[in-house]
Amino acid sequence: PLKPMARVASGGETARLMLALKSTLAHADATPTLIFDEIDQGIGGRVGAIVGQKLWRLTGAAPGENGDGAAAHQVLCITHLPQLAAFGDHHYTVSKQILAQGDAERTHTVVETLTAEARIAELTQMLGAHSEAGRRSVEEMLGEVAQVKTGALVLN
């Protein structure tokens, strides 16, 4: 017998199903902001890049998709996968700091907008690399993303 999806699907599977539905119904959906929390759960880099491309397309920014009736959405995505994060037009990091407050401690959340240079450093860390070769890999990945965004490269 069929069971409720909430009982059998992981959070990542549910998010990817939502992405598939939103991608299919984007032209008819007027929801201004879509939030995906760890949609990369259980997937690798190659699939992560494809998911990143699909999320980016939901913004209506893909060639031939803006201005032709497609609903443009603001997409917020929480991810740990650099291949997916590379598709973002803006990149933020979120960190937590423990602050001493008298005898107690308080957790403080910090959201930081990354510059282009800081973004490369963050994506390199997300890749698990700390070398110049890792940095070059990130720069190459961002170059490929730029090609996808202009329509010069198609991911399969």
List where the protein language model places each region.
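Flexible loop/turn segments at secondary-structure boundaries
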Residues: 1-2, 26-27, 42-43, 83-85, ...
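GG-anchored amphipathic helix commonly corresponding to the ABC/SMC/Rad50 NBD signature/C-loop
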Residues: 4, 12-34, 53-63
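Long, contiguous hydrophobic alpha-helical segments, chiefly transmembrane helices and signal peptides
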Residues: 5, 9, 14, 23, ...
